[in-house]
Amino acid sequence: VPEDPTANHAVPTGDGTSPAAEACAEVAAERFGSGVEIPDRELLRHHGDADTGPGMVDFAVNVQGTAPPEWLRERLAARLADLGRYPDPADEQAARAAVAARHGRSAAEVLLLSGAAEGFAMLPRLRPRLAAVVHPSFTEPELALREAGVPVARVVLEPPYTLDPALVPEAADLVVLGNPTNPTSVLHPAAVITALRRPGRLVVVDEAFADAIAGEPESLAGERHTDVLVLRSLTKTWALAGLRCGYFLGDPAVLARLDHGRAHWPLGTLQLEAVTATAGPEAVAESSARAERIAADRAAMIPRLRSLGIEVHEPAAGPFLLIRVPDAELLRKRLAEYGIAVRRGDTFPGLASGHLRVAVRGAAEVDRLVEALVQLGFEQR
């Protein structure tokens, strides 16, 4: 489907560029740069995998487990013999149908992705005049937009990181936010997110961690709004970071613009099989049970950290916690000496110094973390 050459912002309205939009775009471009020079590029490209290493107790990466469950590994292994052939269109159709059924959507409302990162990289194709990115949050969307020369306005939330639609510039025709939000673990009410909608604006919600919350409250994945685009990822819940699987849910016309110009066979056979397998009813039930365990582990982990005088941000809904200590970088390095990896917090726009992100883990791993913290001078209270 050819992209509309007259479409120069996310949701075309045909009213031209307003003076307010031009002014905001100029301010954002001056403040945050274009695709030519991005001084903080390395910070925006930093991810938790850079903070961990082989053999470490990993609190830095939010993937649940070290490998996919056995049944999923068997499903993928059964398709290895098919790798000598190009991906079958029937497999793509099956994957889209499975995702559509899982969320109560039509297959036309599903765009399969080679990981959530590919979805973020597609956003500049919508030609927004001014993008607003809500922070603190995952940094990949902002980087993708800025590298494409899209003016970006940062909407930085202050603790307790409550979303206020009034903070978003009215001129923004593209708004990107996470729910639940990485790294704050805040879950925004769906009604507040939909309050961001405006004529000519597209709202993109990164729900990469939504299935890590039992019942997926506040999710918009099953809602039909032509101006809301939802991004999902298989990486975290199913330990598939190395396979790169995800999908967009949204209006078919918007998905067509994102898909235009894409390379043929964007997903391979194993990726398509993984999408189909994890969208089935049994897999969804397993994911829900896992989310219940995460909630229990989180509830047990928070008081143990607080008993050491560590500030833990709440409310926390996701499979990770945002903590604050006097010298975060020193603590991160000292914990690494004890074989424990935690995620830097200073690379997230809007976070004050002293923040770290720690994945929610089970009792045995938390024991290791607490023991190391005590050895480093944190006293039980």
Show the residue positions of the predicted features.
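Active-site phosphate-binding strand-loop segment of PLP-dependent enzymes
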Residues: 153, 158-214
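PLP-dependent enzyme catalytic core of the Aspartate aminotransferase-like
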Residues: 2-3, 337-338, 349-381
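PLP-dependent aminotransferase class I/II
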Residues: 67-69, 90-93, 227-306, 310-313
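Conserved beta-loop-alpha segment that forms the PLP phosphate-binding cup at the N-terminus of a helix
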Residues: 92-95, 99, 107-131, 246
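Conserved PLP-anchoring active-site segment centered on the Schiff-base-forming lysine
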Residues: 124-146, 151, 158
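Conserved PLP-binding catalytic core of the aspartate aminotransferase-like
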Residues: 294-295, 305-338
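N-terminal "arm"/small-domain region of PLP-dependent enzymes with the aminotransferase-like
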Residues: 2-86, 98, 171, 201
